Amino acid sequence: MRIIFLGSPSYAVHALDALVAAGYTIVGVVTQPDRPAGRDRRLTPPPVKVAALAHGLPVLQPETLRDPEVVETLRALQPDVGVVAAYGEILRRAVLEIPPLGYLNIHPSLLPLYRGPTPVAGAILAGETVTGVTIMRLDPGMDSGPILAQAMVDLPPNARTGPLTDELFRLGATLLVEVLPRYARGEIELRPQDHSQATVTKMLKKEDGRIDWTLPAIVIERMTRAYDPWPSAYTFWRGQMLRIMSAAVAPTDASATPGMVIGRSAHGHPLVQTGSDALELVEVQPASRRPMSGAAWLAGVHAPEITLG
């Protein structure tokens, strides 16, 4: 079976590695162009490119798949099926129609829930207790195609987007190589999604991470985990950004101004008034400094009153 693979970030490498280990012929790996990264803005290849070159696979890095010349290049590879894992661009019909078996996509949610670009963050923000991964066949819509297989996992109360995303793509890679042979033989009945049950996530922006202290503490605590590693949950003190790396809900009947530090926890961490309950700042990162305990940060703040905003 001739496979064309589309993916970009580190967690997409799990699927590429699994396909190579299973002995499939990868006729091409399509990934995003090298981009400037890091403080020195050095041109950096996507992790999938690094993995593909290590496997000796041909790599394509088009700026967009909408270019007709790119479409013809993909067609010339004569793939039987495509596999997509967080490539970073919705595939248009001209691309979708190239492989006879279409494109299979690994999506880190239990579709039709949490379609779109940020399903893991969406599940954490919503306080879900279970999530999972879906193998589905792409159609021209956004994560709306029929389902081949799903696997469910518990979503622990301390789950963070970065590690959970990696875990789900590992699981998805395993599920993919299990179902791919049966799919190719026509032994899997595709299950249409119930579009009436669909929920959709949005692309995150940096400002999404700014904390509104009038929100309930439980919502802000979820933000610290859902927005890790990016855009992070943050606030400001004396005009400087303060990232909230880890936090805990602290029940209180106090009625201070939201954002005001109203005391210390048993561990010495600051307790911040929110719209409902207080939030214990367990770990924070001041601007241009390393992460530190909330207690250490509070000890270095010399002010009779602290209000974050």
UniProtKB/Swiss-Prot annotation:
CDD domains: FMT_core_Met-tRNA-FMT_N, Met_tRNA_FMT_C. PANTHER family: METHIONYL-TRNA FORMYLTRANSFERASE, METHIONYL-TRNA FORMYLTRANSFERASE, MITOCHONDRIAL. This is Methionyl-tRNA formyltransferase. Belongs to the Fmt family. NCBIfam families: fmt. GO terms for molecular function: methionyl-tRNA formyltransferase activity. The gene is fmt. It comes from Chloroflexus aggregans (strain MD-66 / DSM 9485). Attaches a formyl group to the free amino group of methionyl-tRNA(fMet). The formyl group appears to play a dual role in the initiator identity of N-formylmethionyl-tRNA by promoting its recognition by IF2 and preventing the misappropriation of this tRNA by the elongation apparatus. InterPro entries: Fmt (IPR005794), Formyl_trans_C (IPR005793), Formyl_transf_N (IPR002376), Formyl_transf_N_sf (IPR036477), Formyl_transferase-like_C_sf (IPR011034), Met-tRNA-FMT_C (IPR044135), Met-tRNA-FMT_N (IPR041711). Its EC number is 2.1.2.9. The keyword Membrane does not apply. It catalyses: L-methionyl-tRNA(fMet) + (6R)-10-formyltetrahydrofolate = N-formyl-L-methionyl-tRNA(fMet) + (6S)-5,6,7,8-tetrahydrofolate + H(+). Keywords: Protein biosynthesis, Transferase. One of its GO terms (cellular component) is cytosol. The keyword Protein biosynthesis applies. It holds the Pfam family Formyl_trans_C. (6S)-5,6,7,8-tetrahydrofolate binds at S109, L110, L111, P112. HAMAP family: Formyl_trans.
